Amino acid sequence: MRTRVKICGLTREQDIASAVQAGADAIGFVFYPASKRHVDPVRAAQLRREVPAFVDVVALFVNPRPDEVQAVLDHVAPDLLQFHGDETPQDCGRYGRRYLRAFRAGAPGLDSAAGLAAACRQYADAAGWLFDSYSAGYGGSGQGFDHGLLAGVQADPASRAIVLAGGLHPGNVADAVRAVRPWALDVSSGVEDAPGVKSADKIRQLMAAIKSVDQVAR
């Protein structure tokens, strides 16, 4: 199976081009004002025009108001929503759009395999479950986590697609793919020169490392 890849936190046209040319399956825009990678709907709409057919656009939110999500839907027309805060199943499903639900593995209540699996099951209609590491703030932490916490999710026959995040970069992504065998990866800071400024070289290195593992697994 080929591991899908989303490059998140894009803010520049040239970085979208780098991600697409390297073979990314999806790109992500962050609509969380506290993030250094935040873009507003108008800017995201401009960037979205650089995304070709068959590359998905994902809109990331953290505890948004409904009108904030609607503005993104109207301006950007994302293919997928991603909720990275404390959103309930009702919050995530109210827009009638496909969505990813992110879980911060290691957070209180999510610090055991059983606890994490139980939380995930509340979002059975999600298109995928994304797993990031826990930190005091919201959004991506840029740090890894104990992948053993995913054991309950991996053993669940009703599991949704597993999307792995958390400190992934060209130097560790191959080991992460071998250990977890996720459906997809979500990478941001691990392919950056600075927050919101992606490195074309790091993106290429990341994609090459993933491809090398996928080829062996066939």
UniProtKB/Swiss-Prot annotation:
Keyword field: Amino-acid biosynthesis, Aromatic amino acid biosynthesis, Isomerase, Tryptophan biosynthesis
GO molecular function: phosphoribosylanthranilate isomerase activity
Domain of life, source organism: Bacteria
Listed SUPFAM superfamilies: Ribulose-phoshate binding barrel (SSF51366)
GO biological process: L-tryptophan biosynthetic process
EC number: 5.3.1.24
Pathway annotation from the record: Amino-acid biosynthesis; L-tryptophan biosynthesis; L-tryptophan from chorismate: step 3/5
Enzyme class, first EC level, given as a word: isomerase
Catalytic activity: N-(5-phospho-beta-D-ribosyl)anthranilate = 1-(2-carboxyphenylamino)-1-deoxy-D-ribulose 5-phosphate
Alphabetical list of InterPro entries matching this protein: Aldolase_TIM, PRAI_dom, RibuloseP-bd_barrel, TrpF_fam
Family listed: Belongs to the TrpF family.
HAMAP family: PRAI
Protein known as: N-(5'-phosphoribosyl)anthranilate isomerase
Designated gene of the protein: trpF
